[in-house]
UniProtKB/Swiss-Prot annotation:
SUPFAM superfamilies: Homeodomain-like (SSF46689). The gene is emx1. Residues 203-212 have a biased composition (Basic residues). This is Homeobox protein EMX1. Belongs to the EMX homeobox family. PROSITE patterns: HOMEOBOX_1, HOMEOBOX_2. The keyword Nucleotidyltransferase does not apply. One of its GO terms (biological process) is central nervous system development. It comes from the Eukaryota. It comes from Danio rerio (Zebrafish). Residues 133-192 bind DNA.
């Protein structure tokens, strides 16, 4: 009724021991470590069970991965030999805007990099993070400075046709004349403040407050009150 089975001891050794004898597995062949998978798998992305790719956008993958050769070497050489590929270290194989695909899609400065002559050096010099070039100061000749000083003595503000005529007579642009007059007015105001000194500035402030007091109290006075005197 019951099939005869071999007797088993209920010792720890008999319970832990395996019933089947240990079989040696086949040794790993060196050719099994060759990474010869097609590079198209990088472009298509890993297919999830739901059927959606983790990398749906092909722009996220560098174009160098398509040209990679399959890696085949012995297991003991993996830790000793450095992996250097010419596609990553050679400038002749590097795409100009491969690492900056968002630059061409930007509506503010994307039009500046359209064309075949775009390089990474151009991107660093004229890109969004490039420094603004300093404005070159105009070196005026002595005769030009003399004419400009005379025009400033007549009028501190030269605009319109007068500025255009002055610029043409001095072989300068209107922007250069405009900037010179702006700087000259700033220098003139600074010189006036230095000549007047702090005492004159304080007296002007005092007279201003006195005039406001007279207007508020409807009082008139022909003489000026010295606000700097102690009396």
């Amino acid at each position: 009724m019951f099939s005869a089975t071999g007797k088993r001891c209920f010792t720890i050794e008999s319970l832990v021991a395996k019933e089947s004898p240990i079989t040696l597995e086949d040794p790993i062949r060196p050719t099994a470590l060759s990474y010869s998978a097609p590079a198209d798998s990088f472009l298509n992305g890993y297919q999830s069970p739901a059927g959606r790719a983790l990398y749906p956008n092909p722009e996220l993958v560098f174009s160098e991965t398509v040209n990679h050769a399959p890696l085949s070497m012995h297991p003991h050489q993996l830790g000793s030999a450095p992996l250097q590929h010419p596609h990553f270290f050679g400038t002749q194989h590097r795409e100009p805007l491969n690492f900056y695909p968002w630059v061409l899609r930007n509506r503010f400065f994307g039009h500046r990099f359209q064309g075949n002559d775009v390089s990474q050096d151009t991107l660093l010099l004229h890109g969004p993070f490039a420094r603004k070039p300093k404005r070159i100061r105009t070196a005026f000749s002595p005769s030009q400075l003399l004419r400009l000083e005379r025009a400033f003595e007549k009028n501190h503000y030269v605009v319109g046709a007068e500025r255009k005529q002055l610029a043409n007579s001095l072989s300068l642009s209107e922007t250069q004349v405009k900037v010179w007059f702006q700087n000259r007015r700033t220098k003139y105001k600074r010189q006036k403040l230095e000549e007047e000194g702090p005492e004159c500035t304080q007296k002007k402030k005092g007279n201003h407050h006195i005039n406001r007091w007279r207007i508020a109290t409807k009082q008139t006075g022909s003489e000026d009150i010295d606000v700097m005197s102690d009396a």
